[in-house]
UniProtKB/Swiss-Prot annotation:
<comment type="similarity">
    <text>Belongs to the phosphoglycerate kinase family.</text>
</comment>
<dbReference type="InterPro" id="IPR001576">
    <property type="entry name" value="Phosphoglycerate_kinase"/>
</dbReference>
<comment type="pathway">
    <text>Carbohydrate degradation; glycolysis; pyruvate from D-glyceraldehyde 3-phosphate: step 2/5.</text>
</comment>
<dbReference type="GO" id="GO:0043531">
    <property type="term" value="F:ADP binding"/>
</dbReference>
<dbReference type="InterPro" id="IPR015824">
    <property type="entry name" value="Phosphoglycerate_kinase_N"/>
</dbReference>
<feature type="binding site">
    <location>
        <begin position="21"/>
        <end position="23"/>
    </location>
    <ligand>
        <name>substrate</name>
    </ligand>
</feature>
<dbReference type="GO" id="GO:0004618">
    <property type="term" value="F:phosphoglycerate kinase activity"/>
</dbReference>
<feature type="binding site">
    <location>
        <begin position="59"/>
        <end position="62"/>
    </location>
    <ligand>
        <name>substrate</name>
    </ligand>
</feature>
<feature type="binding site">
    <location>
        <begin position="340"/>
        <end position="343"/>
    </location>
    <ligand>
        <name>ATP</name>
    </ligand>
</feature>
<feature type="binding site">
    <location>
        <position position="36"/>
    </location>
    <ligand>
        <name>substrate</name>
    </ligand>
</feature>
<protein>
    <recommendedName>
        <fullName>Phosphoglycerate kinase</fullName>
        <ecNumber>2.7.2.3</ecNumber>
    </recommendedName>
</protein>
<dbReference type="InterPro" id="IPR015911">
    <property type="entry name" value="Phosphoglycerate_kinase_CS"/>
</dbReference>
<keyword id="KW-0418">Kinase</keyword>
<keyword id="KW-0547">Nucleotide-binding</keyword>
<dbReference type="Pfam" id="PF00162">
    <property type="entry name" value="PGK"/>
</dbReference>
<comment type="subunit">
    <text>Monomer.</text>
</comment>
<feature type="binding site">
    <location>
        <position position="113"/>
    </location>
    <ligand>
        <name>substrate</name>
    </ligand>
</feature>
Length: 387
């Protein structure tokens, strides 16, 4: 993957426009989870250290496009950055007709979704963004799968368009896991629906030596083996698809499960064989024997790609399966890459972040990359690198 990297450029005195992913949860004007800002900080600090005139922007939430809405302002992000940086930081609300930035200063440009035409990759808006800078840095892997004015359009018109350190690291890590993985390669795909992950399952079935399924997805595979899944979340119309995948790839289907009669945090868990699930029960986690089987597979892996929990880990009674799998990944000597919101929440819950080789910041972008789809922002950077 050939792109210009920000780390290869001399940014001194240059106007640098960084498109970061600062889309963080905010409550009462305060950032409640700073993971994405922390991930973006090294890029911002590097540009400032080089003496660049630094602008950074992002989307935040889903405001009505083209309208300012205080609820979706980047002000809480600015206040967070002021605490973390020794450099001056200020928020600029109206910037499309130009903005003055001093060397060593950080200017945060207000939420890009307040600009009409952002989501449609409007050419006029893209050119206005490009006119603000000498160097455009795309560093938001989480939005690289969307062709929008601040992630894609600007890069076509800026003097220089490059990949920031965070984006470059994402592409390197995913490339390492998917293009030439050390084997055996094990992929874990959890989540509630086969339909939303079908292309991912299909792509990984061709790459992985073993494909582990979890959550509602696993229930569809359990049904495909002829077992009754009771009231469990599963997709009857995709049972044949699950049967097909079972013939093309090595997929260990759970042999025992934890069930409950209601979907509730306080519902007691009953451990039983998949042969014994009753009509009024729902499967909410894999059982101990199944979890240990997966742990053994993961122990011998050389590459692990993890997307999604294997049970409803948010409920303490149905956490054990995901915890065993998570700890097996953490203890493995394999190159491990994890992505997706629920996966990151599980990593935080079990405190294993420092034991995962690479944690992806992208949700949809992570999945689309795994599917083998072209990410518009990355394609644009590759195109610009040729010129």
């Amino acid at each position: 993957m050939s792109v210009i990297k920000m780390t290869d450029l001399d940014l001194a005195g240059k106007r640098v426009f960084i498109r970061a992913d600062l889309n963080v949860p905010v409550k009462d004007g305060k950032v409640t989870s700073d993971a994405r800002i922390r991930a973006s900080l090294p890029t911002i600090e590097l540009a400032l250290k080089q003496g660049a005139k630094v602008m950074v922007t992002s989307h935040l939430g889903r405001p009505t496009e083209g309208e300012y809405n205080e609820e979706f302002s980047l002000l809480p992000v600015v206040n967070y950055l002021k605490d973390k940086l020794s450099n001056p930081v200020r928020l600029v609300k109206d910037y499309l007709d130009g903005v003055d930035v001093a060397e060593g200063e950080l200017v945060v440009l207000e939420n890009v979704r307040f600009n009409k035409g952002e989501k449609k990759d409007d050419e006029i808006l893209s050119k206005k963004y490009a006119a603000l800078c000498d160097v455009f840095v795309m560093d938001a892997f989480g939005t690289a799968h969307r062709a929008q004015a601040s992630t894609h359009g600007i890069g076509k018109f800026a003097d220089v368009a490059c990949a920031g350190p965070l984006l470059a690291a994402e592409l390197d890590a995913l490339g390492k896991a998917l293009k030439e993985p050390a084997r055996p390669m094990v992929a874990i795909v959890g989540g509630s629906k086969v339909s939303t992950k079908l292309t991912v399952l299909d792509s990984l079935s061709k790459i992985a030596d073993q494909l582990i399924v979890g959550g509602g997805i696993a229930n569809t595979f359990i049904a495909a083996q002829g077992h009754d899944v009771g009231k469990s979340l599963y997709e009857a119309d995709l049972v044949d698809e699950a049967k097909r995948l079972l013939t093309t790839c090595n997929i260990p289907v759970p042999s025992d499960v934890r069930v409950a009669t209601e979907f509730s945090e306080t519902a007691p868990a009953t451990l039983k064989s998949v042969n014994d699930v009753k009509a009024d029960e729902q499967i909410l986690d894999i059982g101990d024997a199944s979890a240990q089987e997966l742990a053994e597979i993961l122990k011998n892996a050389k590459t692990i790609l993890w997307n999604g929990p294997v049970g409803v880990f948010e409920f303490p009674n149905f956490r054990k399966g995901t915890e065993i799998v998570a700890n097996a990944i953490a203890d493995s000597e394999a190159f491990s890459i994890a992505g997706g919101g629920d996966t990151l929440a599980a990593i935080d819950l079990f405190g294993i972040a420092d034991k995962i080789s690479y944690i992806s910041t992208g949700g949809g972008a992570f999945l689309e990359f795994v599917e083998g789809k072209v990410l518009p922002a990355v394609a644009m950077l590759e195109e610009r690198a040729k010129k």
